[in-house]
Regions:
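Alpha-helix N-cap/helix-start and coil->helix boundary motif
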Residues: 25, 47-48, 93, 144, ...
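Short glycine-rich anion-binding loops that position phosphate/pyrophosphate groups of nucleotides
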Residues: 8-11, 69-71, 143-144
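Glycine/GP-enriched mid-protein hinge/lid loop-to-helix segment characteristic of carbohydrate kinases
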Residues: 30-130
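Glycine-rich phosphate-binding loop and adjoining helix at the ATP-binding site
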Residues: 1-62, 149-161
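Conserved residues at the C-terminal ends of beta-strands
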Residues: 6, 66, 140
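ATP-binding/phosphotransfer module of carbohydrate and carboxylate kinases, centering on a glycine-rich
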Residues: 35-38, 103-188
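Flexible, active-site-adjacent loop/turn segments at secondary-structure boundaries
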Residues: 19-21, 94-99, 141
Length: 188
């Protein structure tokens, strides 16, 4: 008997921090455990999705998942290396909101356009590749039409041979469900 949840924000030992929605160290797991008899497992949404995607494929040992939920929003990254989910200290691995990335001067004007989405996605894919060098980066961004566009932009900054496979996906639900189940079962 288990309830497995997938939420945005930093999730560490059942405590959720998502400041833009007013959650600052919310003890959600303890609160839910008082109300329900089932074991409660809470994970970050991007980590849940990357786990589900990884489990549904056999081609890659190492993947990263770049997620921009809201057009023009900050997003997040999930990493799996050789089957291991990388959460980092205090589970903040992938919290790209803390990266000091510089964008073009007119980025605030274009961030909700395909041009702005391409700049955002390219810069974070370059960062992921430089730091983690996964076999593939899975991209979820509604304004990116083709992953090839991102690859062409990345080639302006790094050798083509360094660029991982880039895979754009359109739907998250199945990967989130698989990830919730797998991460929940790990805690049983």
């Amino acid at each position: 008997e288990l309830i497995s949840l997938s939420l945005p924000g930093v999730v560490y030992n059942g405590v959720v921090t998502l400041k833009k929605y007013g959650l600052n160290e919310c003890h959600l797991q303890a609160f839910l455990e008082e109300k329900y008899s089932q074991k409660i497992v809470i994970n970050n949404d991007v980590n849940t999705i990357v786990m589900g995607y990884f489990a549904s494929q056999d081609d890659y040992e190492s993947i990263s998942f770049l997620y921009q939920a809201r057009i023009g929003g900050t997003g997040g990254v999930g990493h799996i290396h050789r089957g291991h989910l990388i959460k980092g200290r205090h589970n903040i691995a992938g919290e790209i909101q803390y990266l000091p990335i510089s964008f073009s001067d007119n980025y605030q004007e274009i961030k909700k356009t395909p041009e702005g989405a391409l700049e955002w996605t390219t810069k974070y894919c370059l960062g992921i590749t430089s730091m983690v060098a996964p076999d593939a980066i899975i991209i979820y961004n509604k304004l990116i039409a083709h992953s090839e566009d991102v690859k062409k932009e990345m080639e302006k900054y790094m050798p083509k041979s360094y660029i991982p496979d880039l895979i754009k996906i359109e739907s998250l639900k199945e990967y989130m469900l698989i990830g919730c189940i797998l991460l929940g079962l790990k805690e049983m």
